[in-house]
Amino acid sequence: MGIIGAGHVGSTVAFILATQGICQEIIIKDLNLDTARGIALDMGHAASATKTHTIVRVANEPSDLRGCDVVVFCAGSPRQPGMSRDDLLLANAKVIRTVLSEVKPYIQESVLVMVSNPLDAMVYTAIKESGLSPLQVLGMAGILDSARMASFIFEKLGYGSDQIVASVMGGHGDDMVPLPRYSNVAGVPITELLEPQEIEEIIHRTRNAGAEIVGYLKKGSAYFAPAKSTAIMVEAILKNSHQVFPCSVLLQGEYGYSDVVGGVPVKLGSRGVCEIIELELLHEERERFDQSIQSVKSLIDALYHHAFFVSSRP
């Protein structure tokens, strides 16, 4: 598998995959070759220490990514304090265009996992720029947001950390849609375990978790949880597990939307998206989901407004 961008998230994804022996070979591509070489060498030592025998090497040329089953795209500018994901829109869209123009001839058989923010708009951009089927391009967000929600549920309850299932849909931003009704502890809905005010606090912290971390770090943003969430996706794809995870994908009629990306439950396999699962949403849940998708649509519209894409919007 390949990793584009050897910053905090990309290198941590590589570390997790290498030390768990999830893949045979990891190829790291970064603008700074020396940085990539140093990380690859260090990572290879870590793999050896854990007896996984995963090979970690550097992509000296774009063609070195040929044959990768999965390519994780982490390149781009991170969020800084006071910066929203939306501020990153044009800058990171240009990064995606530049990098994919170099590597796309060699990744046509790969599944492309996007991590760069603003996530949903970057997934859309990658679909447009890569030439891949929309089923081969998906974004890592829902697993991360659900993990954050599960962590906050555990903070409130104080038990059942390994039995908590949290569900978050919609865009990866301030309008994401945590779903308490689909969140449970060993099958018991959290609506039966927590007071409404406690659930609202969990929803608020889930939506603002990324910004909260940025505020504490001052420089940079979260990377441990995003990297682990990405590694979970990669493992499911490589193992053709058909496990269901919330992922950001292009909607083509699902939930009544087309030509827009949103986070929804997806069955993952070796070719990417096997199936998009449509949940039944109550009226209030549906309204929040619609609002979230409209926020993503406004970002995509902004890219068209700035004439980023050659073609007009379908």
UniProtKB/Swiss-Prot annotation:
EC identifiers of the protein: 1.1.1.37
One Pfam family, short name: Ldh_1_C
Listed SUPFAM superfamilies: LDH C-terminal domain-like, NAD(P)-binding Rossmann-fold domains
Keywords tagged on the record: NAD, Oxidoreductase, Tricarboxylic acid cycle
Oxidoreductase among keywords: yes
Keyword flag Oxidoreductase: yes
List of residues binding NAD(+): G5, A6, G7, H8, V9, G10, D30, N92, V115, S116, N117
Ligand binding (substrate): R79, R85, N117, R148
MF terms in GO: L-lactate dehydrogenase activity; L-malate dehydrogenase (NAD+) activity
Active site: H172 (proton acceptor)
BP GO annotations: lactate metabolic process; tricarboxylic acid cycle
Catalytic activity, as annotated: (S)-malate + NAD(+) = oxaloacetate + NADH + H(+)
Function (record text): Catalyzes the reversible oxidation of malate to oxaloacetate.
Family named by the database record: Belongs to the LDH/MDH superfamily. MDH type 3 family.
Protein's name according to its UniProt entry: Malate dehydrogenase
Species of the source: Wolinella succinogenes (strain ATCC 29543 / DSM 1740 / CCUG 13145 / JCM 31913 / LMG 7466 / NCTC 11488 / FDC 602W)
Recorded name of the encoding gene: mdh
